[in-house]
From Swiss-Prot:
Protein name (record): Protoheme IX farnesyltransferase
Membrane-spanning parts: 31-51, 56-76, 105-125, 126-146, 153-173, 181-201, 214-234, 238-258, 285-305
InterPro entries xrefs: Protohaem_IX_farnesylTrfase (IPR006369), UbiA_prenyltransferase (IPR000537), UbiA_prenylTrfase_CS (IPR030470), UbiA_sf (IPR044878)
The encoding gene: ctaB
GO biological process: heme O biosynthetic process
Coiled-coil spans in chain: none
Length: 324
């Protein structure tokens, strides 16, 4: 009898568990993780490593909801081409496990949750920026550029660069030059992150008529463009050190070391543009690059890191004259 009663509880039913998994998949959690890392880094730098735990967790939860909403709407719009591609045809919407109206309600609920969490847990500016991120991703990238321009990921990449603005605004209530440099870092990093992936699955994009750069302009051109954008990353990342002086020597060292590895891989890709394993290597490293760069920002912004750096500088300044 007891077993029968428990079996009738909806949330213990296997079908309910699968539905929860399907909704979770609509949000594209792997993408969300990268957004949250950049948001966290911005908050850490903006607060000099002293952000409050409540604000930190509230902002990250809201960011996850906003990104999940945008990704769900993207899945709704792209369900037709997802059905055609073998790689994506088993996703919740093209497979029919989730209906469009259900996904729409889910996306709206996530967006509203994100807005109110930020509006009441942080400030209105961060809430509006999160909504702007959704609007840019859906309006500019998904609806306008993805199926019409080879520059879709370049211009549409602005949406992925908004999370650090949200994090910065949540802490400070404003957007300084440093916040916009963080935006620029993500904006410039997006093409050399995404284009190698597009090179890996070029056949899929060609099959459904999506004009990604490798489909329209070829592998060699895409590899060259990847190299150029990777080249631009170093001077932009170092703007946080000079002239803005919001990050120090530890971050600069990490940024340079990571960039050397990144540009080396991007150069290798230009030499073998048809090598999909090389494209995969660049794609994977681009993720590691961003994660470690953000970690470097965070550690560099900690008070004790700054104290160690200033103390070491004073010792060095006192030591150099004694040598002379």
């Amino acid at each position: 009898m007891q077993k029968t009663i428990w079996a009738e509880v909806p949330w213990l039913h296997p079908g309910f568990a699968q539905t929860c998994i399907d909704f979770y998949q609509l949000t594209k959690p792997r993408l969300i993780l990268l957004f949250l890392i950049t948001t966290a880094a911005a908050m850490w730098v903006a607060s000099s490593g002293q952000v409050g735990p409540r604000l930190f967790l509230t902002t990250l939860l809201a960011g996850a909801c906003a990104a999940g909403s945008a990704n769900t709407i993207n899945c709704i719009y792209d369900r037709d081409i997802d059905y055609i591609m073998e790689r994506t045809r088993h996703r919740p919407l093209p497979s029919g496990r989730i209906q469009v109206w259900q996904a729409s309600v889910f996306a709206a609920s996530l967006a509203l949750t994100a807005f109110f969490l930020l509006a009441f847990g942080a400030n209105l500016l961060s809430a509006c920026l999160a909504m702007a991120g959704i609007a840019v991703y859906i309006g500019v990238y998904t609806y306008w550029l993805k199926r019409s321009s080879t520059q879709n990921i370049v211009i549409g990449g602005a949406a992925g660069a908004i999370p650090p603005l949200v994090g910065w605004a949540a802490v400070t209530g404003e957007l300084s030059w440093a916040a916009w440099v963080l935006f620029a870092i993500i904006f410039i990093w997006t093409p050399p992150h995404f284009w190698p992936l597009a090179m890996m699955i070029e056949e899929d994009y060609s099959k459904v008529g999506v004009p990604m750069m490798p489909v329209v302009n070829g592998m060699a051109t895409t590899a060259n463009q990847t190299f150029i954008y990777t080249l631009l990353l170093l001077p932009v990342t170092l703007l946080l050190v000079y002239p803005l002086k919001v990050s120090g020597a530890l971050y600069a060292s990490i940024a340079i070391v990571l960039w050397v590895q990144f540009i080396h891989k991007a150069w290798q890709l230009t030499q073998t543009p048809d090598d999909k394993q090389m494209a995969r290597s660049v794609f994977k490293f681009s993720i590691l690059y961003m994660m470690l760069l953000c970690a470097g920002m965070g550690v560099d912004s900690l008070p004790w890191t700054q104290q160690i750096w200033h103390h070491s500088t004073h010792i060095l300044q006192a030591w150099i004259p004694s040598i002379g």
